[in-house]
A protein has these predicted regions:
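Conserved glycine-rich Rossmann-like NAD(P)H-binding loop of the short-chain dehydrogenase/reductase
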Residues: 28-38
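N-terminal Rossmann NAD(P)H-binding glycine-rich loop of SDR-like oxidoreductase domains
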Residues: 2-28
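Oxidoreductase cofactor-interface core, primarily capturing Rossmann-like NAD(P)-dependent enzymes
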Residues: 124-255
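Conserved Rossmann-fold NAD(P)-dependent oxidoreductase catalytic core, especially the SDR/UDP-sugar
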Residues: 29, 81-143, 147-155
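Mid/C-terminal beta-alpha module of Rossmann-like enzyme folds, strongest
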Residues: 217-285, 298-337
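Structural motif
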Residues: 5, 73-74, 112
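NAD(P)H-binding glycine-rich loop region in Rossmannoid oxidoreductase-like domains
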Residues: 37-107, 119-123, 224
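Hydrophobic residues within alpha-helices
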Residues: 15-19, 101, 136, 220
Length: 337
């Protein structure tokens, strides 16, 4: 029996490796379309012999795109970047690249197309990342009206760039940044429990709704099969919303490191982002600061994980398992930190 073929663009990345495992378990032949097939060769062990097929393709090259989707029943586009560098910019990747994939899928009579976007995608956003994600969605629908759009919040999992980054930061500094909080403490006079309370964090700053990478992968597989998914947009978030302060407190508690949480103004972050973005693979960019200015949570009334039959996994159930490597060990544990 010939197995159905699912082409996954960007399948060697963080979400991709989890999606490939889910698709293989679901019985599909997975064609991993990446610029360098060697980057995806390690994923072949996730399936039977011949089930996982690394494939050379570039979303900017129509010839390789056509070959990558030829004979495929479904296509998933995971390709995205967090920062720009030279020709690798948001417009080329998130907008034109997405349009190219959709055009190739339509020309090949592919049955299903799933595009991974992001919560906050909006052409009126102050962040180019969000603007180009929204433009990419529009381009996808123009070429492939029955596409399914998946918008995840911050994705967490063993290889994530969010929690791992801040946990690593906590190993080297006594101060942890929180975003979107009042820079000047709020004085609250004559409250129920004191004459004067000093509020350093306000409402806790920017809000996030982290979603587990395995849940995202399961949702994509479900979207490829669900009869009512074509033409729909889903926003994926975990079961809880956390403020910037909540996240830093949870993270430092998990790794057993007490740290001072300091509100950092966006203007200060923007200066550093502007400076750091001038080097390859920057830790922070100006555009990322603009993204932090907006809450990253599921919109009211949006279709969610539940609509795809996936139960959201709490961050507290997963984070300790892979952040434990950031805990104090040896001489660190014996000293006061």
């Amino acid at each position: 029996m010939v197995k159905r073929i699912v082409t996954v663009f960007g399948g060697s990345g963080f979400v991709g490796r989890h999606l490939v495992r889910h698709l293989a378990a679901d019985g599909a032949t997975v064609r991993i379309a990446v610029r360098d097939p060697e980057d995806a060769r390690y994923l072949k062990i996730m399936g039977e012999v011949g089930q996982i097929v690394p494939f050379a393709a570039d979303i900017r090259n129509e010839t390789t795109l056509a070959a990558a989707v030829d004979g495929a029943e479904s296509v998933v586009n995971l390709v995205g970047i967090l920062s720009e560098w030279r020709a690798q910019n948001f417009a080329n990747v998130h907008t034109q690249g997405a349009a190219n994939v959709a055009k190739a899928a339509a020309a090949a009579d592919v049955a299903r197309l799933v595009q991974i976007s992001a919560i906050g995608a909006n052409e009126k956003s102050g962040a180019r990342y969000a603007q180009t994600k929204a433009a990419g969605e529009a381009a996808i629908y123009a070429e492939f009206p029955n596409a399914t759009i998946i918008r995840p919040s911050v994705i967490f999992g063993p290889e994530d760039h969010f929690f791992n980054f801040f946990a690593g930061l906590a190993r080297f500094t006594w101060v942890m940044p929180v975003f979107g909080c009042p820079v000047i403490p709020i004085l609250k006079w004559f409250t129920d429990d004191a004459i004067l309370n000093i509020d350093f964090y306000g409402d806790g700053g920017t809000k996030f709704q982290p979603v587990y990478v395995d849940d995202v992968a399961a949702a994509i597989v479900s979207a490829l099969a669900a009869e009512d998914a074509p033409g729909k947009t889903y926003e994926l978030g975990g079961p809880s919303v956390y403020s910037s302060v909540d996240i830093m407190r949870m993270l430092t508690k998990i790794i057993g490191r007490k740290r001072l949480l300091v509100p950092i103004p966006f203007w200060y972050l923007a200066i550093w982002g502007w400076l750091l973005q001038k080097i390859p693979a920057p830790l922070l960019t100006y555009d990322q600061v603009k993204q932090l200015e907006a809450d990253n949570v599921v919109s009211e009334g949006a279709k969610t994980l539940a609509d795809l039959g996936v139960m959201a996994t709490p961050a507290e159930a997963i984070l300790p398992g892979y952040l434990s490597r950031f805990k104090k060990v040896g001489h660190e544990a014996a000293s006061s930190t």
